[in-house]
Amino acid sequence: MRALHRRGARIAFYEKDLPYYAAHRDLAAPDYCDLRLYSSWDDIRTAALREAAASDIVVTASYCPDGALISDEILELDGPLHVFYDLDTPITLNLLQDKGTDYLRREQIARFDLYLSFTGGVVLHQLEREYGARLARPLYGCVDPDAYRRTAVREEFRNSLSYLGTYAPDRQQKLDELFLEPARRSADMQFVLAGPLYPNHWTWPANVRRFEHVAPAQHAALYSSSRATLNITRQEMADSGFCPSGRFFEAAACSAPILTDWWKGLDAFFDPRDELHLVRTADDVLSCLNAGDAELRAKAERARCRTLAEHTGERRADQFLGFCDEAYRRQYSPTEVTA
């Protein structure tokens, strides 16, 4: 959004004021958009629909509380381009085949002018061919290089390996193998795990430092204080492929060596041999952590250069506007599997 604002866009961002996010809000007063917090849709419905009707583009997103209900009303507006942005498309589609979601119904997909997906690859074909999406395009995560860059080490974050992520059951097996087991076998190393919702009854290795929440403004310091950082992909996302986490690019922009599991399409974003460290077992992780600093830093620097060239907010803003223009014209070529 910041990059779009720099291009002259005026952005109104509506967010439901939920208790957890209220306690950990990233920005109380962002300078690149008008933040509109609301307690219930009914409270702001009239004003929001009036503002949406006067807009060029209206975007609704996955996980928006009551999003399907809101989209029903947004989609009735004649003026704006209707866009849906899905941050977890494979998960959304699996839910639609099962119990459904409260942020999107299957029949709504065909009504959006543009369906943007945080995941690329074959899921784009699936959206168009099986769900009737008019135009499905990938809009991957990105990084703001002004906010994410190498900083001085902070002692409270200093570690040999960090992992930043919310608890998810389908990541647990990999978390145990690639993070907790290396910690158990390396009493002389310090590990940092940051993120909410981990079970209270868990017993952590003594050398794992826990942070329930690290504000985005401190992410760069955490990455810069990590000798290496770990990326773990949710299984449904990994099965689909082409699913880079935004934190992937944030860590790379901070020159943090990245250890990661493999998923289809990873090599479309980074060179797995020259820019990343692929890990499948605890032994792989320990081998990386026992490597020399020069080897770790060389790959990290190559990943940083790749990120700044291809994965910034500026690049994504250009892509977003290009996809919107494509949707306006309604003349597009078939989606490529490697998109």
Question: Over which residues does each language-model region extend?
Answer:
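Extended catalytic core of nucleotide-activated donor transferases of GT-like folds
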Residues: 1-2, 6-7, 11-127, 131, ...
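Conserved catalytic-core segment of nucleotide-activated headgroup transferases in glycan assembly
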Residues: 2, 144-228, 238
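A structural signal for isolated positions on well-ordered beta-strands in alpha/beta enzyme cores
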Residues: 10-12, 83, 137, 162, ...
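Structured loop/turn residues at beta-strand edges in well-structured enzyme cores
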Residues: 53, 77, 110, 131-134, ...
